[in-house]
């Protein structure tokens, strides 16, 4: 049952069976209820950090930042960049003590949960899963740290 409640996964990003996201227990619900009081503040903070990233990395050549249409006002859960040089960028950021994550390293059509579709050819999904890199992001991040992270990414882009 735990596996089914966690997207059909025992190991992060490895879906063995089809599952759902049903991990909210009463304690987590109580904590989230308290956090709702600062939701607007956190949303504004996330937007500010995304703006900094967009401004500082927007002219990068080897790094693609999230596209945001003029009319859109995203809330921002993650800040995910794309680069064909993901491992190099991740390594350089790690050397600068900047943690990153890869969301999601295995595309859905290659998960065991969808083994009936594993033979599908989805080259765009395959390419994206090899290029995406999530940068540190959230309301906890200071403006100074956001600037440092973006400038480090930009420097790595120039060296690529």
Question: What label would you give each PLM region?
Answer:
Residues 1-160:
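PLP-dependent aminotransferase class I/II
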């Amino acid at each position: 049952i735990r596996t089914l409640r966690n997207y059909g996964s025992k190991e992060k990003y490895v879906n063995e069976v089809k599952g759902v996201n049903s991990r909210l227990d009463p304690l987590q619900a109580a904590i989230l209820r308290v956090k709702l009081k600062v939701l607007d503040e956190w949303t504004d903070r996330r937007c500010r950090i995304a703006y900094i990233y967009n401004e500082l990395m927007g002219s990068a050549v080897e790094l693609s930042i999230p596209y945001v249409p003029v009319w859109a006002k995203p809330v921002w859960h993650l800040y995910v960049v794309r680069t064909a040089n993901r491992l190099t960028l991740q390594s350089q950021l790690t050397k600068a003590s900047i943690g990153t994550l890869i969301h999601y390293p295995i595309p859905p059509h290659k998960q065991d949960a969808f083994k009936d579709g594993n033979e599908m050819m989805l080259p765009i999904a395959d390419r994206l899963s090899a290029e995406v890199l999530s940068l540190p992001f959230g309301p906890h991040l200071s403006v100074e740290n956001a600037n440092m992270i973006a400038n480090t990414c930009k420097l790595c882009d120039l060296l690529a």
